[in-house]
Amino acid sequence: MIDFKDPQIRYLIDFANIKQGLIKYQNTFLNRQQLFEFIKNEHYGFPLLLPLGIKYFNYKSSKSIFKISKTLIMNKIFKIKKKNYVGLKIFFNYGEKFTHDVELKNQYKKQFNYIINFNLKLIKQLNFLKNKKNYLTAFQTRNIPHFGHEIIMQRLLNKKGKVVINPLIGTKKKGDYKNEILNKVFKKLISEKDYNNNLYYGPVIANMQYGGPREAVHHINIREKLGFNRFAIGRDHAGAENVYKPLEAYNFTKKKIKKYKIDIFFHKGSYFCERCN
């Protein structure tokens, strides 16, 4: 097991995701030049960088240490004005100096392999379903389900194939629902509703970055690499603290539709109609 309460574990998770090939445009933590490539190419998604001083890594082999300003990341990646935004604070939690050419310490390979094997199990499950000619949609959430979620999932099921509730269960901000609660609630939902074996629960160990529109693209790219056929993008996707407009991620990702190799189901959330009940 791994300790999700350890704030440094997010970098081990990022590292494992990169090495497993789940991060489409990265094969290691980014250097300075690669970061600017991410900034220029918004369809790359959210950049994963490694700050100095993370206990899981040996920095002795590092030959490139670079500094990145908070203003740059705030303006070009998060595209917000709130300097104390939670996503920005997480990004710079260990300072403004970063590197990329490091090695994983031997004593943490067990935790690294746990992440790899957990996600590999999901990939194998998806491949098993796809081998039966199923069309698979990933439904992202970090909240417990409400009736609106059920309506969206039912729409997805009515359109085509099977739906996998696929939350990111890496590190999260204070106030987000714990992974154990999501696991318990969604499994109970599936067991109590008649979904005819078309709705599944399959989380992936990956981190929330709270990057708004850029992270919505990041989520699309991860689902492509996991092996999904389709991903749902909706209202308030991957933001926090109301710094993004409700449909900002929706509009941002829709403009880049030609850049994705999987289908996207765009929705504007669900609403209750008092007139029609």
PLM-predicted stretches and their roles:
Residues 1-277:
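Active-site cores that bind ATP or allylic diphosphates and position pyrophosphate for catalysis
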